[in-house]
């Protein structure tokens, strides 16, 4: 594991040096600019591109993580301080952009089993084989988790998001780059990227839940990065709301490149209409 990590960091830093060399070299170019001249990367884009390389490279991520199955456990802490565990299985097929992704999350709690499905820009639920409309809070949470995620940075170019550098900072002795991302829906996320490893250590954002009048400050921290099929993935994620931990997600297994049937993302009502 240590050898793989060192190789990954060596590759990322080597590419970083090459990128910086290209940028510096292009600065002294005084000839006419053609339509084919590549656009120079901004400081924020440089950081994001190296983070993508450190995670496995855009090509590898697009190929390996095109589809897959992730299984794990979610622990939610209620206002009374009690924790409720949910087992989940997430199956997904990536599109060219996040909005074209297909995602199905099957949840199992001690009280019930249900699924949330995102496809064709719509979200619906399934319980006992019948569709239902999820609560506004559940829908908003689903959308928020996709919009303010690690993948949102790794896929910023595909999603046509804009990046801006907020400088460099130090938190608890750790040097980090600070990158602000704004997506096409004007949702904003701030990422804190390790200067040493170029991994995203945590992200922050604000959102106003349905029915609330004031925004909530969210922080999502990433731990336990592991090597999975030539890509790096955090196996533990902790979400806090206004400084209080509310959700902890642990990945148990993840497998990429498996065939996912398209019928899994189809609304049962639409399926019965299509196939009477």
Where is each model-derived feature located?
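N-terminal mature ectodomain segment of secretory-pathway/periplasmic proteins
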Residues: 38-40, 46-131, 162-165
């Amino acid at each position: 594991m240590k050898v793989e990590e060192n190789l990954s960091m060596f590759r990322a830093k080597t590419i970083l040096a090459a990128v910086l060399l290209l940028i510096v070299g292009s600065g002294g170019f005084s000839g006419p600019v053609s339509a084919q001249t590549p656009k120079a990367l901004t400081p924020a884009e440089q950081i994001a591109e190296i983070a993508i390389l450190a995670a496995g490279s855009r090509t590898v991520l697009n190929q390996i993580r095109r589809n897959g199955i992730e299984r794990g456990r979610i622990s939610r802490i209620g206002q009374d301080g009690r924790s409720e565990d949910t087992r989940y299985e997430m199956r997904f097929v990536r599109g060219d952009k996040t909005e074209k992704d297909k995602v199905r999350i099957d949840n199992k709690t001690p009280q019930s089993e249900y699924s949330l499905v995102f496809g064709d820009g719509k979200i619906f639920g399934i319980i006992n084989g019948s569709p239902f409309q999820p609560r506004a809070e559940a829908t908003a949470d689903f959308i928020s988790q996709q919009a303010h995620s690690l993948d949102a940075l790794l896929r910023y170019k595909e999603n046509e998001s804009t990046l801006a550098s907020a400088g460099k900072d130090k938190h608890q002795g750790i040097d980090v780059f600070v990158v602000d991302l704004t997506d096409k829906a004007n949702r904003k996320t701030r990422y804190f990227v390790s200067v040493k490893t170029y991994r995203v250590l945590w992200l922050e954002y604000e959102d106003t839940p349905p029915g609330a009048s004031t925004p909530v400050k969210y922080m999502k921290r990433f731990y336990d990065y592991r090597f999975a099929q030539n890509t790096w993935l955090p196996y533990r994620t902790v979400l806090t709301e206004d400084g209080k931990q509310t959700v902890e997600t642990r990945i148990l297994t993840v497998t990429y490149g498996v065939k996912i049937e398209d019928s899994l993302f189809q609304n049962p009502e639409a399926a019965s209409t299509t196939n009477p």
